[in-house]
Each structure stands twice: as C-alpha cells, then as structure tokens.
Amino acid sequence: MKDKRAELLGKYPVKKLLVKLAIPATAGMMVNALYNLVDTFYVARGAGEVAIGALTFAFPVQMIIMAVGLMIGIGSASVFSRAYGRNDREKMNNVVNTAIRIDAFLSLILAVIGFLFLDQLLTFFGASTSNIEYAKDYLSVILIGLVPLSLSMVLNNLARAEGRVNIAMYAMMLGAGTNILIDPLFIFDEVTFCGTTIPLLGLGVRGAGIATVLSQIISFSYILTKTFSKDSQIRVNFKNWLDIHFETVKDIIVIGMPTFLRNSLGAFLAILILKLISFYAVGDSDIYQSVYGVINKMIVLINYLKQFQT
C-alpha cells in the first residue's frame, strides 16, 4: 500500500494525478458546506429565525480557528511532502509531531480566550439584545469543539500529502452526515412520524451546538485512527509534548501564512458587516444579521460548486 502511494505521487501523470487528488477533496468540502445550510434550516425551524443569528456570530470565530488549522495543515503538508519525496522518515515524523503540537496549543489558547471574553466578543461583533443569548448558548458549546476541529484540518492535509485523499473526504462526509442526522434530535421538542408523536431533547440552538461538536469529535476520531494506522507513514510521539522543532515551526508558518491571512481576513470582513448591520439597520438588527448568515452559507456552497466544476 505504501509503495503504491509512493508510485502514484512520484510517477503518475500530473494532470490525472491533480484530478484524482482534487475531486475527493472538493467533494468533501462541498458536503461540509451543504451541511452548514442544513444546520441553519434546522435551527430556523426549531428555534426561530432570530436564532440563526447565533450561527452567524459563530462564523467569524470558526473562520479564525479554521485559518489556524489550515495554516498549520497546509504548511506542514508542504514540508511533509518534500520529506516524503526524499523518503526522509525522520523529517516526516518531525513535521507531524511539531504540527500537531503547535496546532493543539494555538487552538486551545483561542478556545480559552473565547470562553473568557465571550460576552465582550459578541457585543463587539454587534449582537443585539434579541439574539445575544442565542449566540451565547451556541458559541459556549461550539468553543469546546475548536481543538478537534482544528486538529482535523491538520490531519486532513497531512493525509492528502501522503496521497490518502479518500480518508480526508470520508472524514468530512462522516462529520457532515452525523450532524445532519442528529441535529433534529437535539434541536426539536418532538417530531411526528406516521401519526405518532416522538419526544426529542428540544435544546434549541444549544442543541445545534452540541450536535455540531459531537460530529466534529466523531470526524476527528475517524481521521485520527486512519492517519496513524499501520498503512500510514505518519507517526506521532505522544510522550514528550514539549519536543517541538522550531526550525520546522518556521517552515510551516512561512508556507501556511498566506492561507491564514486569506481566511482570517474573511472572518474580519464578516465581523465588519455584522457591525455595519447593527449600526445602520432600521429597527432590530437581528433579522438582518440572520439573513446575512444564510446568504454567507449559500455563498460558501456556491464557491465550492464552482471549484468542483473547474
């Protein structure tokens, strides 16, 4: 299996290899974008249109943590790929260990900051008196899943760098599919099926957050077990968490920084638009912010569809 992947990456025609690697990655991200729309639909039906604002305010926070995960993931994948081409196993393991450690550290720091300053962040984002409680309910849960979310992005990129693109796709699809299935269980009070009323948990927007975090943990568990299976060349030393190679950190960040800037600028743009809505909206701004959140998720899905076509 390892020799087959090495031959694929080293000798396969570039154009065919690009299609073979790109389609699973784009398909997985497209399903991920679609589930975000479904998540919004469930929240609107179960908690009302004002509650969609909770997902809207969570978007910049998730974008920033995704920017960190992509920075570490893409940077480490590039360094790993070069070591993979040289068959430098020591460097490969060094990159993986360093990437996981710094990503876990950075995402944990961001999650702690989010918990400590949640009220201040939401006020700064422009949350109104109508939707700030919804946003607090949702984000207080979502912050728990930031570390596995960010680590999943790192492991997804490393799996692709090793030529195991299907594993990354399955991980994203597993997380999205799980979220779509369990969202109603946590959000709705009850559901009627074949004339029978079935009681559910009825946690509203907090339930949407719980379902999202659980799906992220399931996706992370899958990619974790597959990434470090016997068929993989990726190995992690879990004993010494302070064993970080700063030269490797520099290489990873230099390569991944443009990706971080691009995604974090998207988060800051979302914050700016939310603040403008709260300032200029006629009457309560909560509905306008919810509409912006829905449009934003549709734009993300359309962008992935465009990537799939190209």
In which residue ranges do the predicted regions lie?
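Alpha-helical transmembrane segments of multi-pass membrane transporters/permeases
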Residues: 103, 159-185, 206, 210-213, ...
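Signature of the first transmembrane helix
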Residues: 16-77, 81, 254-278
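Small-residue-rich hydrophobic transmembrane alpha-helices
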Residues: 52-112, 149-168, 274, 289-310
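Residue-level recognition of pore/gate-forming positions within transmembrane alpha-helices
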Residues: 25, 33, 60-63, 98, ...
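Helix-terminus/linker motif at the lipid-water interface of multi-pass membrane proteins
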Residues: 34-53, 122-129, 187-195, 199-203, ...
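Hydrophobic transmembrane alpha-helices of multi-pass small-molecule transporters
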Residues: 179-183, 220-224, 301-304
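Short alpha-helical transmembrane segments in multi-pass integral membrane proteins
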Residues: 1-22, 80-147, 194-257
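Hydrophobic/aromatic residues within transmembrane alpha-helices of membrane transport systems
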Residues: 27, 39-43, 55, 80, ...
